[in-house]
């Protein structure tokens, strides 16, 4: 566990671009389908129980949450997507906010896309990955809830996802991850370290290698 991430603290929740922190420094954003385990992953990576609040009502939170690691580095929790019961007006507002953040944020260095390892690459995941490709963003895929299946099938799924992304022209690293068992934390930290300028070389072992 890299102690650097344990100092993460809540900075601000933003419903509009004009509420975002100043566009400087470095940010890494986390995106994922509702119930994919995004908030739990952020909490485990920062070794905090309730840094990113989990919701029992998927799709309810439509804010972008910023967490400060130090004066110039931030983690960003994007709204969960893909929940069918969210009203159409809310979906449109969410999409506009996300397009603005992903398209205009100069300090954004990478995007972590969180997927349930049992249900990876949904249509909404592909939409998010398409935005990242258009922007030229670095992408890392966390296949969460890896404790739900055996290690062999988990690694097979990671390789299959990496292959599918490569076939789609999307450069990405992919790894299984379990918030419950805290598996994959060091690999994920290696990617974050690279994007946030904390190390010269990536330390994570990508399934695609």
Swiss-Prot record:
GO terms for cellular component: cytosol. GO terms for biological process: division septum assembly. Transmembrane segments: none annotated. InterPro entries: G_ENGB_dom (IPR030393), GTP-bd (IPR006073), GTP-bd_ribosome_bio_YsxC (IPR019987), P-loop_NTPase (IPR027417). The keyword Magnesium applies. CDD domains: YihA_EngB. Keywords: Cell cycle, Cell division, GTP-binding, Magnesium, Metal-binding, Nucleotide-binding, Septation. Residues 24-198 form the EngB-type G domain. GTP binds at residues 32-39, 59-63, 77-80, 144-147, 177-179. It holds the Pfam family MMR_HSR1. GO terms for molecular function: GTP binding; metal ion binding. It comes from the Bacteria. Mg(2+) binds at residues 39, 61. Its cofactor is Mg(2+). PROSITE patterns: G_ENGB (PS51706). Necessary for normal cell division and for the maintenance of normal septation. PANTHER family: ENGB-TYPE G DOMAIN-CONTAINING PROTEIN, MSS1/TRME-RELATED GTP-BINDING PROTEIN. Belongs to the TRAFAC class TrmE-Era-EngA-EngB-Septin-like GTPase superfamily. EngB GTPase family. This is Probable GTP-binding protein EngB. It comes from Thioalkalivibrio sulfidiphilus (strain HL-EbGR7).
């Amino acid at each position: 566990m890299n102690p650097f991430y344990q100092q993460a603290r809540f900075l601000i929740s933003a419903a509009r671009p004009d509420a975002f922190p100043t566009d400087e420094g470095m940010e890494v954003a986390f995106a994922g389908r509702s119930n994919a385990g995004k908030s739990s992953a952020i909490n485990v990576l920062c070794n905090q129980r309730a840094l990113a609040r989990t919701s029992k009502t998927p799709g309810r939170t439509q804010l972008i949450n910023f967490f400060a690691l130090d004066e110039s580095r931030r983690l960003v929790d994007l709204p969960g997507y893909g929940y069918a019961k969210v009203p159409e007006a809310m979906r449109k507002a969410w999409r506009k906010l996300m397009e603005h953040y992903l398209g205009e944020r100069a300090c954004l260095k990478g995007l972590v896309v969180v997927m349930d390892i049992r249900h990876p690459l949904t249509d909404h995941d592909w939409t998010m990955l398409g935005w990242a490709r258009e922007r030229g963003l670095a992408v890392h895929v966390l296949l969460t809830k890896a404790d739900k299946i055996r290690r062999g099938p988990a690694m097979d799924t990671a390789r299959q996802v990496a292959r599918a992304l490569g076939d789609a022209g999307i450069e990405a690293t992919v790894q299984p991850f379990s918030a419950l068992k805290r598996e994959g934390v060091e690999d994920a930290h290696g990617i974050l370290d690279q994007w946030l300028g904390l190390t010269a070389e990536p330390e994570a072992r990508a399934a695609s290698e």
